[in-house]
């Protein structure tokens, strides 16, 4: 089973035994492959999630009907060996790092996004995340999208007129132009698949 906190700062996904007892503050997916993990933990899915989800303070509220059910996964992602391998490498390294440091997901990702954090293993985790993003983008055949990240600040408009802006924590992320490009492609793909489903009358709509 793949799980993610319903509200969290980082939308960090984990693979847990099916016998685990979950609270209602955890979203559960009946998936367990590393390819599924790679797709969900990737920045393309994060871009989609941040566009469609609501926020609670600095946290992200993950709603499956908005963030998961509408997400256009790459074609044949379940059998994509490159996606499986990238997800496996990232997941295993992250798990080993958490055991070594004794830190959970939130504190590990706080280090991941900290511009002053230069521990070699955190740097390696960032590299593996970029490799996982590359595998996901390649699965979409979007080979011309770059995976380079920067430490950037996000801002949240406050007030009805947007006159006040609240600074949010640093994030190691894609530049805005890359995020916007990937989101536009995902929205287009989502619309194409919804139209195909409507024309054939088979299955559920993607949107």
Give the positions of each predicted feature.
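S-adenosyl-L-methionine
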Residues: 1-207
